[in-house]
Design a protein with these regions (language model features):
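Outer-membrane beta-barrel proteins
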Residues: 1-258
Length: 258
């Protein structure tokens, strides 16, 4: 991808695999090594990644207001499928949607906006994105626009940092289009995927740091029916104990995850 840095005016990026604006916000809790999605996937890591390619991303510089350091990130894609195209080519809206999301049809524009505020040891960030779903193949069971969002808060005091984050992902698909017995995948299933993470990290000294992270990922079908078949919510719990040691140019990092 290509980036244009404009000094005090910020940075504009475009191309493939830019990371979009969401990479600054998803799973953003203190960790000694890696996010909990490094060993397995969770919905928080997916939030906003449909804007990773075919998009224009703007990152503002930091500016101070009443002692608070603020920054903003904005992104726009005319074809928000997260799939890149070669020089002189374009992605096909129909086949790209099938490949990326498994639902057929097409989709349109995508928008994303994030903001970060820092005050002394406290950092707060929030991001949200929306993507148009336009699927003419579903007839009466029309889809609606998808929404994905995440927020986090971190606080550092001396060698100790704590953090908490929540994410929300609604693909906008209709429950009638997904069989009850079908495995519920992110962006292929109706309902809502939500996640919450909390962590604590400790810098033992300038070379050694450790952290503990707990993540709970929940799928809610949103059927909420008094009759017929109710699809039970499913929750995935994961924990990670991490350690990192560095000495000069050498570093050793490891984690144990369940």
């Amino acid at each position: 991808y290509t980036s244009l840095t404009m000094g005090s005016l910020g940075t504009i990026s475009t191309g493939t695999d830019t990371g979009g604006a969401s990479y600054k916000y998803d799973e953003e809790v203190p960790q000694a090594y890696e996010q909990t999605s490094d060993a397995q996937q969770n919905s928080a890591n997916i939030v906003g990644n449909q804007m990773d390619s075919n998009s224009i991303v703007y990152n503002s510089p930091s500016f101070d207001i009443a002692g608070i350091s603020l920054s903003m990130d904005a992104e726009y894609s005319p074809n928000a499928n997260g799939i890149g195209a070669g020089d002189g080519a374009e992605t096909d809206k129909v086949t790209a949607f099938v490949a990326a999301d498994g639902q057929g049809g097409n989709f349109g524009k995508g928008y994303g906006l994030g903001a970060t505020a820092k005050y002394q040891g406290l950092t707060f960030g929030a991001y949200g994105s929306e993507r148009e779903n336009n699927d003419p193949t579903l007839g009466a069971t029309k889809v609606r626009d998808a929404f994905e969002g995440v927020w986090y808060a971190k606080y550092s005091m001396g060698p100790v940092s704590v953090g908490y984050s929540e994410s929300y992902l609604d693909s906008g698909l209709n429950a009638a289009d997904v069989a009850i017995t079908t495995a519920k995948g992110i962006r292929t299933a109706s309902g809502i995927f939500s996640s919450e993470s909390m962590s604590i990290a400790f810098n033992v000294n300038e070379n050694l740091s450790v952290s503990y992270t707990s993540t709970e990922d929940t799928y809610d079908d949103q059927s909420n029916t008094n009759g017929g078949v109710e699809v039970a919510d499913v929750t995935q719990d994961s924990t990670a104990l991490q350690i990192a040691y560095s000495m000069g140019a050498m570093s050793v990092k490891a984690y144990q995850m369940e």
